[in-house]
């Protein structure tokens, strides 16, 4: 590990042509497979010693470059000792180390940018719940929203060129091109969408790197125009298109925007476009008319088609009013509703009522998809009626209760930001009764007899846990405690959302 740190320090002062030699370093594969330096995945699977591991990688790369090894029949795989685990073991072995190698320059860029901007590293900013206070503050004053599903890149060469434009390591990205095209040859009979799904499962680290970089490239262009939209009318298209970092090497993209986009730049003068994204889904919201949102929609479609060669139909991007439609984001249904309030005022002997209407962002738990997920996990049926969990019935009573409580705690932790708690109580009730039925099944008893023998206070933790946590935060403020428990709470320690 010390050798790896020294190598990273040397790389800070160099160009990014150091990536290709990293593929031949043993500790890269130790990092990739979470093994020690004396216990590499190459040594375990292929039976070679540490001294010859460098030679193994060289041989694998050489064989990958040979045309006759890119297409190998099933009979040949039986004769080849390298094909003992998977049919594409060549690329599988090297792609793991390659994924670690290509992450290095971008990690260095992130560290240097944080140091240069003197940004304090805060884990709270990483929480996906931190976006909801932003929605509460901004979306109450907005009128239109559009949820956009970022399409997957289909053309392999676009992925390679996009990644190569940021890191100048030609040899390394020639190898990346070989990985992708070899994998495409092995799965040429399936659809592009299915190919992406298969590739993401077989090479998750490399897929995440490529997809994140693809989204970053998309957002860099999109957010650049968003930030510059207030003075786009004053900026000539010639200066705008000279930014090679944002518009990478596709002449058709420049030609289309040079001819057709000049007449539409005027419509992008808007300082109230708000953007949020998690994984592949993004949200656009605006205060102005739907005409502006339509312009942004067609801009995104042209951006995907001309820059990434991805076809997207305009009908898949919907523009809705926040007051009439909900948008699905991060497991919540959110919309803006009117919250009327009446204030009584008295001046001397005259009193009158003042009706005040305020907009409020509502976050609602999608109860039907949640019940469907619980039914898939065998906690209830499709109607939401709790059932026992036979798989856990062989465990100890304490372990069974802990398993149910853990899932209840996670759901409660995430969905405490809901405007109403009725749906959350229903989910807790399903898990509570499922736990009781599982315990009764284990003891070969009925639910009624089991509860009668142990008392009605069993499993009260399902409903009292949040109150106990808040009582520790506000030990003396009972009114504040009750108000917070009835209201929504956003936790800043949630870093991912598993759909």
Curated annotation (Swiss-Prot):
One of its GO terms (cellular component) is chloroplast. Belongs to the intron maturase 2 family. MatK subfamily. Its main location: plastid. This is Maturase K. It comes from the Eukaryota. Usually encoded in the trnK tRNA gene intron. Probably assists in splicing its own and other chloroplast group II introns. The gene is matK. The keyword Plastid applies.
